[in-house]
Regions:
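Conserved acidic donor-binding segment of nucleotide-sugar-dependent glycosyltransferases
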Residues: 314-316, 320-327, 336-342
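Conserved donor-binding/catalytic core segment of Leloir-type glycosyltransferases
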Residues: 9, 189-205, 211-215
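Short His-centered aromatic/hydrophobic patch
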Residues: 89-95
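Short hydrophobic beta-strand element within catalytic cores of glycosyltransferases
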Residues: 291-296, 300-303, 313
Length: 378
């Protein structure tokens, strides 16, 4: 794949954990390593990561980068050092606020958008930030959903092309034939029907609704249990809720290593994350790449209808779309799939095929490469 020399500027990159971090890493791994540099903050275990990274790592001493003149000067120096032809900001806020100045000095840029840019698009007083950051961008690739893209497009008022670039999954890592017996044994799940939820533990993701739904699910599917994978600020509250149920109903794995994550998806019979919109519409699920990773493992998905999450499945074919605010709806959807393994299996296989057809990283990176070429000087 031929691409112009590209400097990725981002606060979000491994070994820091998160969905944006994994998306950006997956994209740059598909680009020619000698054509890419990554300008990003320091993080725990960064030295070990950088030592084996195939692309150039330009690690900065701070833990978070703000759009200051000093950071702008360092970006320009890094771009000159690698003779970069284009800058890709991994997110619009905050670092793409430096983009117009870079463009004025002859360095074109793309400004990626995610769920947070939705908030910038609709929250009072923040439109100006978004419009300024993208005012001289060659393009805004929205690395989540058409829902977010529509909102961003309205906010920037047509001043820049806004295009959806749906994230994907590594189908060699996330696949259905992984060995998971040790996970089930260690968590004392055995061969019981298992619902898995992989996500950061925050209120929007809906783990609390899953916990509330488990008694109704178990009344239909005796022995069913729930595995919650991930960490976050809601963990104490969720563990307290789980403590009100029998000890064998809910298991928490905590944060798991990136290399182990596919096996946790594969360990389940159904994947569920009944995400919900909060704060009067200010907080939505921009996409939910966990649904794509679960589908790649041939798991049927139960998806909360918030923001762009509905775009991650074909309702009734690869999973079931639910109102994540309604415990009964979540219990019915999960219970239906656990009670009908043949239907669940068919949905899971359809989901994996959809990932193979439309959500593989090489194809996604090829679209990005086209936009980078369009932005680079002729």
């Amino acid at each position: 794949m031929d691409v112009p020399r590209t400097l990725l500027v981002t606060n979000d990159f491994p070994p820091r954990v998160g969905g944006i971090q994994r998306t950006l890493e997956a994209l740059v791994k598909e680009l020619p390593a000698d054509r890419v540099g990554v300008f990003c903050p320091d993080w725990d275990e960064a030295e070990a990561y950088d030592a084996v990274a195939p692309f150039r790592m330009l690690r900065q001493p701070e833990r978070f980068l703000w759009p200051t003149p000093a950071v702008r000067d360092r970006i320009e120096a890094a771009a000159r050092a690698m003779d970069a032809e284009v800058v890709l900001f991994g997110a619009t806020y905050p670092l793409a606020l430096l983009g117009p100045r870079l463009a004025a000095r002859g360095l074109p840029y793309l400004s990626a958008a995610h769920g947070f840019e939705y908030w910038l698009s609709i929250a009072p007083g923040t439109h100006a930030l978004l419009r300024h950051a993208t005012s001289r961008a060659a393009r805004v690739p929205v690395l989540c959903s058409a829902f977010i893209a529509r909102t961003v497009r309205t906010a920037v008022k047509g001043s820049v092309p806004v295009s959806v670039l749906y994230p994907g999954a590594d189908v060699q890592r996330f696949r259905p034939d992984l060995q998971t017996q040790d996970i089930r044994e260690r968590l004392r799940i055995g061969d019981r029907p298992l619902v898995v939820c992989v996500s950061r533990l925050v209120a929007r993701k809906g783990q609390d609704t899953l916990i509330r739904a488990m008694p109704a699910i178990r009344s239909r599917v005796p022995g069913a249990c729930l595995l919650i994978v991930g960490g976050g600020p809601d963990e104490e509250r969720l563990r307290s809720m789980a403590g009100e149920l029998p000890a064998d109903v809910i298991a928490f794995s905590g944060q798991v290593k990136e290399e182990d994550l596919p096996r946790y998806y594969a360990a389940g019979d159904v994947f569920a994350m009944p995400c919900r919109t909060r704060l009067g519409g200010l907080e939505v699920e921009g996409w939910g790449n966990v649904f794509i990773e679960a589908a790649a493992c041939a798991k049927p998905v139960v998806v909360g209808d918030s923001g762009g999450a509905r775009e991650s499945l074909v309702d009734g074919e690869t999973g079931i779309l639910v109102d994540g605010r309604r415990t009964q709806a979540v219990a019915e959807a999960v219970g239906d799939l656990l009670a009908d393994p043949a239907r669940a299996r068919a949905m899971g296989l359809a989901g994996r095929q959809r990932v193979l057809d439309a959500h593989t990283w090489p194809d996604i990176a090829a679209r990005l490469a086209t936009w980078l070429h369009d932005a680079a000087p002729r």
